[in-house]
From Swiss-Prot:
<dbReference type="InterPro" id="IPR007860">
    <property type="entry name" value="DNA_mmatch_repair_MutS_con_dom"/>
</dbReference>
<keyword id="KW-0067">ATP-binding</keyword>
<dbReference type="InterPro" id="IPR036678">
    <property type="entry name" value="MutS_con_dom_sf"/>
</dbReference>
<protein>
    <recommendedName>
        <fullName>DNA mismatch repair protein MutS</fullName>
    </recommendedName>
</protein>
<keyword id="KW-0227">DNA damage</keyword>
<dbReference type="Pfam" id="PF01624">
    <property type="entry name" value="MutS_I"/>
</dbReference>
<keyword id="KW-0234">DNA repair</keyword>
<dbReference type="GO" id="GO:0005524">
    <property type="term" value="F:ATP binding"/>
</dbReference>
<feature type="region of interest" description="Disordered">
    <location>
        <begin position="1"/>
        <end position="95"/>
    </location>
</feature>
<dbReference type="InterPro" id="IPR000432">
    <property type="entry name" value="DNA_mismatch_repair_MutS_C"/>
</dbReference>
<feature type="binding site">
    <location>
        <begin position="721"/>
        <end position="728"/>
    </location>
    <ligand>
        <name>ATP</name>
    </ligand>
</feature>
<dbReference type="GO" id="GO:0140664">
    <property type="term" value="F:ATP-dependent DNA damage sensor activity"/>
</dbReference>
<dbReference type="InterPro" id="IPR027417">
    <property type="entry name" value="P-loop_NTPase"/>
</dbReference>
<dbReference type="InterPro" id="IPR007861">
    <property type="entry name" value="DNA_mismatch_repair_MutS_clamp"/>
</dbReference>
<dbReference type="InterPro" id="IPR016151">
    <property type="entry name" value="DNA_mismatch_repair_MutS_N"/>
</dbReference>
<dbReference type="Pfam" id="PF00488">
    <property type="entry name" value="MutS_V"/>
</dbReference>
<dbReference type="InterPro" id="IPR036187">
    <property type="entry name" value="DNA_mismatch_repair_MutS_sf"/>
</dbReference>
Amino acid sequence: MELSLQGSLFGAPEPTVNAPNTRPSTGDLPNPFNSDHNLSDADLSKDALARPRRRNETSGSTPTAGVDPDDRADETRDDTTSTDEPAWGHHSQLKPEQLTPVLRHYVELKMAHPERVLLYRLGDFFECFFEDAITLSRELELTLTGKDAGKAIGRVPMAGIPHHAAERHCSDLIRLGYSVALCDQLETTPTKGALLKRDITRVLTPGTVLEEGMLTARRNNWLAAVVVEPATQHQPFRWGLAQADVSTGDVQVLQREGSDGLHQHLARLQASELLWSGDDPAPAWCPDRVGLTPMSSTPFSRPEAEAVLLEHYNLASLDGIGLPEVPLALQAIGGLLQYVGDTQPLEDNARVPLDVPAIVHNGDSLVLDAQTRRNLELTATQRDGLLQGSLLWAIDRTLTAMGGRCLRRWIEAPLMDRSAIQQRQTVVSRLVEKRPLRQTLRRLLRPMGDLERLAGRAGAGHAGARDLVAIADGLERLPQLAAQLNGQLTDGPAWLQALFDPQPQLQELATTVSNTLKEAPPLSLSEGGFIHDGVDPLLDGLRNQLDDQDAWLAQQERQERQGSGISTLRLQHHRTFGYFLAVSKAKTSSVPDHWIRRQTLANEERFITPELKEREGHIFQLRARACQREYELFVQLREQVGLMATSIREAARAVAGLDALTGLADVAATSNFCAPELTNNRELTLSAARHPVVEQLLVETPFTPNDVALGNGRDLVVLTGPNASGKSCYLRQIGLIQLLAQVGSWVPAKEAKIGIADRIFTRVGAVDDLAAGQSTFMVEMAETANILHHATSRSLVLLDEIGRGTATFDGLSIAWAVSEHLAGDLKARTVFATHYHELNALAGERDNVANFQVMVEETGDNLLFLHQVRPGGASRSYGIEAARLAGVPMAVVQRAQQVLDQLGD
């Protein structure tokens, strides 16, 4: 759309001394219509004092003449039309001296980053060549073309992406597991006879990205590093691990023994990237689908790691943070920090803000192995891997991204410290009781930005103007939260105290940002126009000069219109051609002789004048100075925010925890949950317990609640009943309620008395592992062995069908022996669902074993599953009836009944 000068800001009256609606002229300043673009900073500041700008006053930082409708970024490239097949598929096939200067530089950078996809800025595109072009074309389904590399070589593969779409395409590559090196232009005008200066400005890897579009908002993005010591005759396998979410600054280290423990931890962590210095590309302890990034062993050496830690955290000694006690973990965090530094080329005074490593000790959290996490469907469904249908989906009422991440971490690592659990539960209970408080807090939390990640981007020097505005908005809400919390939740977790009395420095920072940046700044910093008027005298002076130029352009349009007699003449601007006078074809005969034809279009002619061309240069230089000054002011502000990243994150984590607790309270209040009584004994007593997920998925029928009683003299429950009657659901709901209680949540039951568990084991369902050469039965036995080796009297064990993958008597014998061991030697609290009705006899042999059954009502040939668990053992499994209900052909069902009758006889 073309914008006429009439009715625009250019239509303002010519500024004269004391004219209405204009700033007064100053006698000793240059005439604005003869403006000198080389005014000194002092002159410009003087102008700003003489003609002060008010906040939100219109700025001249962007072109204000009419905009040409064809003023679009040129996204055409050379070398894209030839159909010749590129001849060279890999950069190593050629000698660098044979290549053109651009390709030679590309190859030099590629040799420094061989493991990464190199995107090389050429004009409006990021290009890839050789093997990277083939990769980019294949993975992103882009056209593979070629570029001429000289007569001796011919064409080489080339593929590219528009620079404005780089983040989206890089995000796709990161999600596919690739690392990306971005080579950008560092100057706009090359030195005479030289190429534009280019260099690597960002290295993006799955574990170190900071960009919002490359991260999952409600999930931590873990980068991990591991150091292992193989087992010897004198010591077991030992390992140290460091994990960091570079986007939030969270850093943890741990050191343990046993390769199984390492495998389980990595399976839970689901790190985006795992660093290690070994040669094996697929070590046995590494779960599938974890991306291994090999590194040199040097960063992991003890001396190198200590030096990196001392420098990064500006410490004199590591003793104060306890790392010498976990030497393997110390080496792991050293390698991780070195990698982060190598992949983050930062501006001066910028550093990715990372917390001092927190040591995770044994016994801090409830142990959940990978099988249990899958069976209980904590964060994803077992069949489809979807969030919907998982526990997290059912109870996540958080309103912020950081609150969502916090709740996920709590579910993945429930607490074992009773006092810490009760502190969370106390807050949940208080918020359930105080509905107005809960609703007010949720209203304040809803618009809160992701302060954790925003602060990280500011500290690393990657934050934009909108990021800083979001930080200020979030910080300005802290006093409102404090006012609501005052005297309300004082007996909650210690970290919540950060919200009761927000740091004054954070409020001062928020005020500074709000007074400096406009509320809705442009996305790109290069556009300018995001700093308020009145912030900086030099910037105000430049804007005054630009306003004067706008007035000159408006006057020039009027003069040329009057002089030519062309009433439809317009003065417009094009990003490539600059300022010009646009005249329709019908009026070209009236064009004055001193006009110079600039461009001919289908319906109009475009002209310039020497005076307009000269003034254009002045305007462009003033605008460039204004944009540069805005950027300088912004960088100063961003550094100021970055220095406060640690304090911002401390407040952000308190907000995240409050969001998680408020969400749990909302679930409890609206879903008829109860506050469990937590004990230090082994009791697990539930009245009218329900499955927190299934009851939400049921639409037409209500969920049937059931009781549970374990631990008070009853260690093993043998659960029998028909197929498809709900035994597996009953097992899972027990495990989920135990877990929710240790998260600090209320639970879906009428009443609950729950002793703290050290581990939850589940063996529900059966799958084979063909890749590992294991049958269904072998997988079942391996899982059972894991339980028997690691369960204690404080563990909760949930078993569904052991021994069914082999001969009947073999399976029964195994199931019997496992049951005896759990009830006798271990005394682990166990519910064992089985179709081996012979196991009901155990209750007559052991006082701590009880029989329960899932009830079914049989009327003629029909079965009605009641889903009610009652004392006693079932004598039938109704397998044939279940087969009929599943749609097995009637002839097969009838024959099965005949065979069953014969076997019974």
